[in-house]
From Swiss-Prot:
Keyword Protease carried by entry: no
Family: Belongs to the NifW family.
Family matches, as InterPro entries: NifW
Description of how the protein assembles with itself and partners: Homotrimer; associates with NifD.
Protein name: Nitrogenase-stabilizing/protective protein NifW
The organism's place on the tree of life at top rank: Bacteria
Disulfide bonding pattern of the chain: none
The protein's role, per its UniProt record: May protect the nitrogenase Fe-Mo protein from oxidative damage.
Gene expressing this chain: nifW
GO BP, sorted A to Z: nitrogen fixation
Keywords: Nitrogen fixation
Annotated organism of origin: Trichodesmium erythraeum (strain IMS101)
Length: 103
């Protein structure tokens, strides 16, 4: 049986994915680990706002949040998702290839 005590002992992305028995591609996790965990962390915070959930309901909601976070990065990437501030700011010192023209 999965418990919040067991859940709170988990450390890395693979631990969470294995705990919830979510099949995963190691390469996808290696490339997007921090982004997956950041999105999952937001999902956990949303679940925790609902204080009326039972332990089982929380675990189920956490699993859904992790599945969603992982699946997002199967079809997308960090630049598209803009999870971290570095991807949210437009850098002024960058010239895009589309802005270069040949005369």
């Amino acid at each position: 049986m999965k418990t919040l005590k067991n859940f709170n002992e988990l450390v890395d992305a693979e631990d969470f994915l294995n705990f919830f028995e979510i099949p995963f591609d190691q390469t996808t996790v290696n490339v997007n680990r921090l982004h997956i965990l950041k999105v999952f962390s937001s999902a956990i915070a949303e679940v925790d706002e609902n204080t009326k959930l039972t332990e089982t309901e929380k675990i189920t909601a956490y699993k859904a949040g992790l599945e969603s976070a992982y699946k997002t990065f199967l079809t997308s990437n960090a630049q598209e998702q803009k999870v971290f501030p570095v991807f949210q700011k437009e850098h002024k010192d960058v010239v895009k290839l589309t802005e270069i023209s040949a005369e």
